[in-house]
Amino acid sequence: ACNQYGYTLALFLVSTKEDEEQIFPRILRRGLLDGIVIQSGHHGDQAIIGRMVDAKKPVVVAGRPFRSDNVSYIDIDNVKAACQAVEYLIGLGYRRIATITGPNSSTVGIDRKEGYIKALSSHQIAIDPALIVEGDFTEAGGYAAMQALLPARPEAVFTASDIMAVGAMRAVRDAGLRVPNDVAFVGFDDLPLANLSAVPLTTVRQPVVQFGAKAVEVLIDLIENGIDPPRYVIMETELVVRESCGAKLRG
């Protein structure tokens, strides 16, 4: 997308506070960049975003930031997508539906958990705290979270990422149970591994390629037409039904 509009892409990996302190002053002082896309959604990113906004730099945040009233961002409707995924499980007849959430320090984790709760509540299904475990978007985290959930005997699990779903399904198999016969799963992201897992994963597909291209389009709009008012773009998702949800067993 950058090449299409005659811009050059520069990539900066900022994984620590030290990285932030070294990289961003150079960007601001030397005028190296016309604009910046920040991959966000974590509470700790708010300071970085704030510095860019205060400097009146064109900024697009990929992933809704915690404070979004004065900065442009592009995202999906995580609440709606999670709600639709859980409602699909409810439609298959599951009632003891657990969730492995994302970190509570991220808007993604918070929003997808909210969607899970919204779906259950709209169908008058009681919210059981024993069926909600916080994860960390890693396979190991998904495995550990599923081990914590197994004593609560969930019929189905909505995981906030495919990577955690892979770990969680492995924990189910290691416990001598079967997917989806004993525990069904729905993930989130539709990464390539979703279709390559031992049991192909039903999951929410994000428009990853379009997401990046749209972020660049919005950034160029900010550069060429001014940063006010902020632009907000919500991309669509879709549920991809595969074997892990048990639809064939229940259909």
How should these model regions be labeled?
Residues 33-34, 94-96, 155:
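Short acidic/polar active-site loop segments enriched in Thr and Asp
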Residues 86-97:
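Glycine-rich phosphate/diphosphate-binding loops that line cofactor/substrate pockets in enzymes
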Residues 95-97, 127-131, 179-184:
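Short acidic capping loops at alpha-helix termini that bridge into adjacent secondary structure
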Residues 1-87, 151:
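Alpha-helical recognition/docking segments in bacterial nutrient-uptake
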